[in-house]
Amino acid sequence: MKKKTSWPSIVIPCIIGLLSAGVYLFPFWIGVENRLYDFFLGLKSDVKEDSSIVLLDIDDVSIEKVGLYPWPRNTIAKGLEALTQLGAEFAVFDIEYIDKSPMSVDFTYLNGALKSEFAASFEEIGANVQDIFAALANNQITLPEAGIYGSELVDLIDQSRDTLYRHTKQVAIENDSYLGQAMRLFGSSFITVNMQDDPPSEGTEDLYAIAKERFVYPKLKVNAPLSDGRHSALVPIPEISRMAAGAGFTNVYIDSDGVRRRIRLTDNIGDTVFMQLAFSPLLKKLGAPEVVIDKNLVTLIGAVYDGKEENVSIPLDSSGMMLIRWPKKNYQNSFTHIPFYLLIDYAESGEKTASSLRLLRANQGWNLGPGYAPIDTCMQLWDESEELRRTALESGAVQDKEAWLTAVQTYWDTVKSFFETDYGTSVAHLFDEAKQAGNPEDAKLYDQVKADFGTLYANAATSYNRHTELETVLAGKLKDAFCIIGWSSTGTTDIGVNPFHSEYVNVGTHAAVANTILQRDFLQQAPVWVSALLAIAFSFGIIVVIRRFSTLVQIIAGVVLSVVVLIVNQLIFNVTGIYIFIISPVLALFVSFLTYSMVSFIISEREKSFLRKAFGTYLSGDVINEMIEDPSMLKLGGQKKWITAMFTDVKGFSTISQGFSMKKVSEL
């Protein structure tokens, strides 16, 4: 007899499958699914971090060393010049420069290099005056000769005056222009564009025109309709916008539960498309590939990875955003971090070295033997390098930049040779020899000048050693680096939540975006309809599998299969990076088997109760139990069976029993 399909095996999966497929219509379940996604992402192996990504932190230590933030823009410019010397490849500013800043005084230069220049110039003038009068007093020169020397001294004074005046003008800094020039000098500086939903403000047309001219990626192909996009943008001031190599928007998307899981790589104002802040310079780093935008995909055609051109497909979710492959570590422990103040320290230690050498040059000890040539060479090369730096800042020409960097390297090579010669020891011996050979009355003077020489030489050596120490440390980390600059001290409010940490400084978001694309370790969420179909399929499938088993086996099988589905989903996520929304399928599977098992149990118990009541008056309990175990026994016409009987009764019993009644036989 063919067994009929019971109504629960049809009705239950239909109802539960459809209900489970529709759970994503409710925001609550989307939030639960996001949390489950975070859990599965935590089980996935950690993403590899690209060593070229460096976060230049304006952190607590930097603020303590440099001063209250926000800093004058000339401070950032000085750090950018240091980055140029150290060979960094990109400087990405997560700092908005939408307002003009006042002019300021470069106190570092005023109290350092300029002060040293004044002291050295006047010491040199004073020493020359003293030498002329001493020579006259000792009848070493005649009055006419003194006149000649006097004329030369006047020329020296005029030259010093002009030089000091020119250098004094550098104390007043037009910070915005200086920062813009430093960005242009660096070459690959990228700034922010903040996309706005509000209409453009009056008078911003010129700034937006600069943005359209300079910040739109040229090799872009859009195959899908653009979204409604934004209505305006906050563009940095012209002094900076005209000098930066490019820009990108900083806007981020936050899920309903406050977690940043995804990012929009492109955004638009009308038909003008802008790139995300990290994505914009990254395209340049990857060889300026063609960018093709489709509905759920961004393709980089001809992107250069490890010297080879590749086509890289970046999957997007249903909203057109890329899932960020976040590192599991916290902000401080993810990627390479360098406090920004070290760049300032690097620049200032170089200036202090030059200032100390200039003071050392004014000491009379050089007259005792080596002459002024060794230190004069150093100072001449420093002045030349500074002049070339100013020229490069003003012109922005590549050849001027290279000339400056070459001059800087020549200067430091010369300074290295200067200190390797160890004039601190050799000149000290010359002082002792001159003291012994000279007038005893001058002994105290020799000791004083010798002590001054030693102090000045030690100061110069200390500054030089600090500079070379910083160069060794920084150059190893910053050579060809993709630097992201932002405020990360405890005073910042720019802190968000990612799938792993409740506090993650948002400067790191740009690092995570860049790293995701550099590693090509993309994540993808399958469309919701896939989960809906799986929910319906699992609802029917689980019942087909368990319907022939007992209730206990059904429960065990249902629980095991639910766990298996979760494990398989995790394996798929680990291997392919594709995450399938799993709540709906697992919910459908679990509720289907549980409901079916309960309904089947209730129906079974009801049938057993009916059989016991119907046949309990004229059938034994054992027979009823057999009927319950095998309901097919309940049919008309009986059963036809071939049965073999084996009699083992007492010999002759059959003959004897024939003479008794049935009752008597039963008693026997």
Language-model segments: residues:
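Non-transmembrane functional regions of envelope-associated proteins
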Residues: K2-F431, D442, E471, A475-R547
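Short gly/ser/thr-rich secondary-structure transition/capping motifs
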Residues: Y37-F39, S463-T468, N625-D630
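Generic recognition of stable, solvent-exposed alpha-helical segments in well-folded globular domains
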Residues: Y178, V235, V273-S280, T509, ...
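Non-transmembrane alpha-helical coiled-coil
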Residues: E433-V473, K479, T490-T493
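Active-site-flanking beta-strand signature of metal-NTP-handling nucleotidyl enzymes
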Residues: I485, W642-S654
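Transmembrane alpha-helical segments that form the functional core of multipass membrane systems
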Residues: G508, L523-V599
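Regulatory cytosolic signal-relay segments
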Residues: S584-K641, T655-G659, K664-E667
